[in-house]
């Protein structure tokens, strides 16, 4: 969709940014590092800068930088494809964070929602979830320690809540 395209357009813009790519080239040449290590070092610097910004929207762009970096490093290492091997239907993915690439690669025939520890309404993973019509709640703090494999979880993306092991009455309300 249009929003999905905008997210990846932002990623392409980053790849075209001479400051970002130029720093990588300089790091390889000046510090005699391999490409993967140079990408990681430059990414760490850019992420630190973006995460320290006052504007929440700009702070959330640090996640985009991490996503682009992860994909570059994965390609340099000759690895590709999805980070998830989900085999069961009605799976709720619970993670510290999901990148836009991770979100786009979720198998929608198996994943019925996702929850993350970090993120906000303007994070690209949240935007991707809305675009793909995947119920999601981001920025839950410590959801990865609260949900165990096999728990029944209701993902209420409208209210921004996750209900872990709800009563039968609550399940009936959400059906």
Q: Model-derived features: where do they sit?
A:
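Conserved, well-structured core domains of diverse proteins
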Residues: 1-75, 80-81
